[in-house]
């Protein structure tokens, strides 16, 4: 395989600096011999070929050293890039983990707060429902008592309506039952007025009793 010409990049080589081709100390004798044998024909051509081979060897050796240096620098750059990527990846991983931890903690605190609010509201609702149940029970009890009072008032009213008829029958005898109306005294109170006054008194007593029960509840 023949080596093709390669453009040499302008790189400063610290390890090895190529010597100028004109200052080589290995081939001055070859050059002198070539100058002496310049008129010799084939001998001079072989001498020039030898000089060219020596110069090309020096050139390619310096080129190989430059390529090696470039490869080393490229490898160092790649390693530095990989290290930077690893550091960035570790940093992002730590940031993600810390963010997850903070978000989970915040979520737990928020959830606990919401549950606490729910519990407080449930307690308030239970207390209100219990108070409402107690009030409804008291209302039912008062309703029952009111019905009993109304029944008692109705019974008293019926008794008061029947008492004048019985007293008239006892006072006037059987003639009253035959249709004869006895004379009424002037100062006697009509039965209806008497019954109405009794009913008003009873209703006032019932109202005062209900008000007393309400005051006791409050």
UniProtKB/Swiss-Prot annotation:
Residues 198-211 have a biased composition (Polar residues). It is found in: Nucleus; Chromosome. Residues 1-32 have a biased composition (Basic and acidic residues). Belongs to the SYCE family. GO terms for cellular component: central element; chromosome; nucleoplasm. InterPro entries: Syce2 (IPR034609). Residues 61-87 form a coiled coil. Residues 1-42, 171-218 are annotated as: Disordered. Keywords: Cell cycle, Cell division, Chromosome, Coiled coil, Meiosis, Nucleus. Disulfide bonds: none annotated. Major component of the transverse central element of synaptonemal complexes (SCS), formed between homologous chromosomes during meiotic prophase. Requires SYCP1 in order to be incorporated into the central element. May have a role in the synaptonemal complex assembly, stabilization and recombination. PANTHER family: SYNAPTONEMAL COMPLEX CENTRAL ELEMENT PROTEIN 2 (PTHR28398:SF1). Homodimer. Found in a complex with SYCP1 and SYCE1. Interacts with SYCP1, SYCE1 and SYCE3. Interacts with TEX12. This is Synaptonemal complex central element protein 2. GO terms for biological process: cell division; synaptonemal complex assembly. Its main location: nucleus.
């Amino acid at each position: 395989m023949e080596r093709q010409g390669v453009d040499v990049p302008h790189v400063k080589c610290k390890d090895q600096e190529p010597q100028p081709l004109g200052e080589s100390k290995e081939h001055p004798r070859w050059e002198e011999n070539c100058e002496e044998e310049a008129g010799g024909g084939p001998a001079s051509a072989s001498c020039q070929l030898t000089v060219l081979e020596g110069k090309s060897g020096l050139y390619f050796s310096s080129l190989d050293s430059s390529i090696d240096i470039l490869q080393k620098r490229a490898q160092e750059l790649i390693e530095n890039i990989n290290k930077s990527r690893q550091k960035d990846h570790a940093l992002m991983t730590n940031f993600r983990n810390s963010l997850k931890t903070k978000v989970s903690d915040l979520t737990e605190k928020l959830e606990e707060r919401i549950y606490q609010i729910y519990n407080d509201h449930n307690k308030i609702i239970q207390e209100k429902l219990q108070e409402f149940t107690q009030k409804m029970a008291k209302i039912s009890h008062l309703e029952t008592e009111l019905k009993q009072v109304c029944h008692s008032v109705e019974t008293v009213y019926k008794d008061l309506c029947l008492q004048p008829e019985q007293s008239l029958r006892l006072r006037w005898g059987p003639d009253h039952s035959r249709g004869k109306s006895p004379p009424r005294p002037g100062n006697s109170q009509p039965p209806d007025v008497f019954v109405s006054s009794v009913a008003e008194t009873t209703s006032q007593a019932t109202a005062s009793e209900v008000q007393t029960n309400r005051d006791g509840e409050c």
